[in-house]
A protein has these predicted regions:
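Catalytic-core regions of core metabolic enzymes
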Residues: 2-168
Length: 168
């Protein structure tokens, strides 16, 4: 399920998707109240059937295979890089810059205070993915998600990782 509704309807739309046992819900909507995001994220954990990506994210793409969200498919190709990013704009920019190398999967997780899928979730998936040989991780200032991801990388990730934290 892909959620494109206005912020005031997003909570109900995500709950409907979780109740329908959708395995993946990508929440593109920006401006969702933090309380609503916290509620539907906790609800998804309680139900245990749905993985949430976002909110306030561009989605995810495995070039030449699938695209869920608003990531333009024509800026990249299939390749060995796994990309996880909080920033939609930097997701697109990185995909464009590395277009000649290509991506196994790129995931825009969103930069809101409460998100579903995290850097660590994606790092774990890329580590386990035989089609991914290197990882690019893009973060933003605020919070400690990038620090937790760095600790996870040092302990569990054997593939090369390039990290960038935007902002100052």
């Amino acid at each position: 399920s892909v959620i494109f509704v206005p912020p005031k309807f997003a909570k109900a739309a995500v709950i409907d998707a979780i109740d329908a046992k959708m395995p993946l819900v990508v929440v593109i909507t920006e401006g969702i109240p933090v309380h609503d995001s916290a509620f539907f994220y906790a609800y998804s954990l309680q139900k245990g059937t749905t993985q949430i990506i976002g909110p306030n994210c561009p989605g995810l793409i495995s070039p030449e295979q699938s695209n869920v969200g608003i990531i333009p498919a024509d800026i990249t190709k299939r390749g060995p890089i796994g990309l996880v990013s909080k920033s939609g704009t930097l997701t697109y920019q990185m995909m464009y810059e590395l277009r000649d190398i290509g991506f196994s999967t790129a995931v825009g997780i969103g930069g809101d205070p409460v998100i579903g899928t995290t850097h660590i979730d994606c790092l774990r998936a890329f580590q386990d993915d035989p089609d991914t040989t290197a990882i690019v991780m893009i973060g933003e200032i605020g919070g400690d998600a990038e620090e937790r991801a760095a600790a996870f990388i040092s302990e569990y990730v054997t593939k090369p990782v390039v990290g960038y934290v935007a902002g100052f």
